[in-house]
Amino acid sequence: MKNVGIISLGCHKNTIDSEKMLAILKEKGYNIVNDENKADILIINTCGFIEDAKRESIECIIEMGKLKKHRLKYLIATGCLSERYNKELLKELPELDAVIGTGDFHKIAEVIEKIEKGKTVLEYGHANLLNDEGIQRILTTPNYYAYLKIAEGCSNACSFCIIPRLRGRYRSRKMEDILREAEELVKKGVKELILIAQDTTKYGVDVYKKFMLPQLLKEISKIDGLKWIRLLYAYPDSVTEELVEEIKNNEKIVKYIDIPLQHSHDEVLKRMNRNTNKQKIEEVISRLRSIPYMVIRTTFMVGFPGETEEEFEDLKQFVKEKRFERVGVFTYSREEGTKSYYMKPQIKKSVKIKRQQELMEIQKEISYQHNLSKVGKQLEVLIEGFEDGIYYGRSYMDAPEIDGVVYVKSDKKLKAGDFVVATITDAYEYDLVGEY
């Protein structure tokens, strides 16, 4: 029995693809290992979204290729970098035995059979297909939460983004398939389902000819044993009144939304081809703020081609005024194959980094004030672990890996996956401390 390992880089959609590949291989009789040093076959599920992600993926391939001097026999690259650079990867990285694009990962077992016969395999170019339906998953997340992909690909045409080329056009999954998977995950012990897609709010537009996310949320919430539903990757132009009402009135949906806004200035939004403007964004924020205790996470991009000091100042004022609970700030990455690649003037790297730091400095104080307002109040916390004599976990305000944590002091015996109501005693810029 051969040992197979997988390293999953990039986004949560990649995580799900990795989990499906593991399930396919386990069913074929392969032994799954977490330690790459024990692997006979190693899969690297790459990210190719921005320059830093590409670099990380390539460095990982080169580093893992060194294991071929020892036990490792075959090295396979899958994911977005493979879809984007396919033939180039095989040519430039001789460590690789196979390259598989985003629409072909379900062929992983066949590919391994071919490389074991001495063939070098290249499979790509099918990013527009939705051909992984019904494949089981081996969860790589803790057993109490899981990501649930509701759609694949993207039909937005943001001028800075390569994703439509790497993941294909937007394809919603059928509601019955999503619900079946959600039920299976909850049966396995999952208490929090985190809904993801390139754009969760457009769910259903292609298949059902209308926005169906509110209905999907309603149906998922009927699953017994499910505690939290969390929504990531919402787009501002598709946040409807119906969706806001569903979030507001459905007890299982945490009052949290991740909604990448990218910028506040109309001219920058126009150059980004974001299909919205500042006024519409403000209306969406106002609608979301009508939900009691709502937490809004967003991301902004600084240093987009042509971003003037005036436009950046507008963004700074916007962040100060809107006081988002959670903010991520990225510097623009110039990517071949995007419209913005050819835009002028391109902003110097030093200016981009300076703007990123300025914006994060503003947000740091806002985040601290938000956290300070929780002191003395009670928060439900999902316990995730125990370290240095203290428990830690997440409240409804925190998505895994990207947000802060709540440290919980307790004499009681708690385990990962437990929900407790903690009294908050202290606050930091991104984390809270409580007692139970």
From Swiss-Prot:
NCBIfam families hit by this protein: 30S ribosomal protein S12 methylthiotransferase RimO, MiaB/RimO family radical SAM methylthiotransferase
A Pfam match: TRAM_2
HAMAP family (UniProt xref): MTTase_RimO
The record's free-text note on cofactor binding: Binds 2 [4Fe-4S] clusters. One cluster is coordinated with 3 cysteines and an exchangeable S-adenosyl-L-methionine.
Family: Belongs to the methylthiotransferase family. RimO subfamily.
Lineage, broadest ranks: Bacteria, Bacillati, Bacillota, Clostridia, Thermoanaerobacterales
Domain TRAM: residue ranges: 372-436
InterPro entries xrefs: Elp3/MiaA/NifB-like_rSAM (IPR006638), Methylthiotransferase (IPR005839), Methylthiotransferase_CS (IPR020612), Methylthiotransferase_N (IPR013848), Methylthiotransferase_N_sf (IPR038135), NA-bd_OB-fold (IPR012340), Ribosomal_uS12_MeSTrfase_RimO (IPR005840), rSAM (IPR007197)
Gene Ontology BP annotations: tRNA modification
Catalytic activity: L-aspartate(89)-[ribosomal protein uS12]-hydrogen + (sulfur carrier)-SH + AH2 + 2 S-adenosyl-L-methionine = 3-methylsulfanyl-L-aspartate(89)-[ribosomal protein uS12]-hydrogen + (sulfur carrier)-H + 5'-deoxyadenosine + L-methionine + A + S-adenosyl-L-homocysteine + 2 H(+)
Organism per entry: Thermoanaerobacter sp. (strain X514)
Function: Catalyzes the methylthiolation of an aspartic acid residue of ribosomal protein uS12.
Keyword flag rRNA processing: no
Enzyme Commission designation: 2.8.4.4
Protein name in UniProt: Ribosomal protein uS12 methylthiotransferase RimO
Listed GO MF terms: 4 iron, 4 sulfur cluster binding; aspartic acid methylthiotransferase activity; metal ion binding; protein methylthiotransferase activity
Domain Radical SAM core span(s) in chain numbering: 140-369
UniProt: [4Fe-4S] cluster 1 binding residues: 11, 47, 80
Gene from which the chain derives: rimO
PROSITE patterns: MTTASE_N (PS51449), MTTASE_RADICAL (PS01278), RADICAL_SAM (PS51918), TRAM (PS50926)
Compartments reported by the entry: Cytoplasm
